[in-house]
Structures are given as structure tokens and as C-alpha cells.
Amino acid sequence: MDGVLVDSNAHHRGAWRALLDELGVTPAQPEYWWLTIGRPSTEAVPLLLGRVVDIAEAHRLADRKLEHYRRLSRHGLPAVRGVSAFLDELAAQSVPCAVATSATRGDTDLLLNRLGLLERFAAVVTAEDVRRGKPDPEVYLLAARAIRIEPSDCLVFEDAIVGVQAARRAGMRVIGVTTAHRETELRTAGVERVVADFEGVTWPA
């Protein structure tokens, strides 16, 4: 969802930066933000801190990051360019669509409702629905099952490397969206095509 349907990556980056500043933590690598993209926040926390974190602390810090994110995005977030028109085209052709996201159910419903996109999807699978986050394929396999489409017949749009890995492990085709990673990185991860957004994207893609 983030970076594919909703243009929210800058707000997430700012929220993680605020959390690290609050904790007085300096990331081990300058591109620390990439460690978080596409992952549930509870799984991103130990990667950012560079140490083992127990479940209680992971949830506490993930909740704090969420507070920062909601503060930064309180005035709303835009949809990724062209996504609404593309979803209209899919609906006109009766193509079933699902969301498979590492975001929470509450944030997913809130953001997609605000943008008028939630009703476009036959199924929404979120962080609460899976035992293992991306790059594990579980979220994508659950989404495919929910819309009754074989994984090999699914096409995924992903901006995150771990998301591309998850979709590929699920046996799905993937198109990369360059809102978070560079084209070369997405192609190395296994996407078959790369787009900047949904302007000019048509179905079949």
C-alpha cells in the first residue's frame, strides 16, 4: 500500500527519523530507511537499532513510531499518481484486486478510505493477518486465496525489495514502482518491469 497506492514514504521516513532521534540512536548505515521499507514496524525496529529487541519493546517502539507517523500525516496523504484511473480501468474489466500490506489494519483502512480507494479492493490483507512479514510470501498467498486467483495468475505492484522477494516466492509476477528503490535494485530483485507511478499504465500491464 505505502509507496504503491499512497504516497507516504517520506512521512514514514520522517517518523523513523523522529523515533531514532528520540532514542538518541545513530543508524549504522546512512541508508537506514531502506531497512524498514515493506516490513512490519515490529520487525524493522531491531534492524534499525542493531540489536535484539524483545517483543514487548518492539511493539512499544513500533507504536511510538506510529504516533510520529500519524502526527506527520495528520493533514492527509496523496494517492500515487495515476492509481485511481488505473483502478477504474481494472474495475471496468472486472479484474479482482487485493491489497497485501505490512501496514496495520487501522492505518490501511483509514488511508484508503480517505482517498476513496478502499472499496476498489475485494480483499485487504494486513500485518495483523500474517505470522511472518515480507519477504515471507504469506501475505501474498493469503491475498490470492481471498480473491480466488492462483498465485501464478497474479500480478503484483511493489515498491519494496522485501515485497518483491515475497511476491516472487509466492510464484507471482511483479512490476516495480520506483517510489522507494532505484530501478536497478528492483530489477535485481526480480521485477519484470519498472514504472515511476501509474500514469499511462494500462491493463493488461
Short names for language-model regions:
Residues 1-93, 106:
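N-terminal helical cap/lid subdomain that shapes the substrate entry/recognition surface
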Residues 5, 34, 79, 97-100, ...:
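Conserved SAM-binding loop
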Residues 10, 101, 110:
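Conserved catalytic-core motifs of eukaryotic protein kinase domains, centered on the activation segment
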Residues 16-18, 68-70, 96-98, 127-128, ...:
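N-terminal start-of-chain detector that recognizes signal peptides
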Residues 74-76, 99, 115:
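Conserved phosphate-binding/catalytic loop of the ribokinase/pfkB sugar-kinase fold
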Residues 88-91, 104-205:
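Asp-based, Mg2+/Mn2+-dependent phosphohydrolase catalytic module
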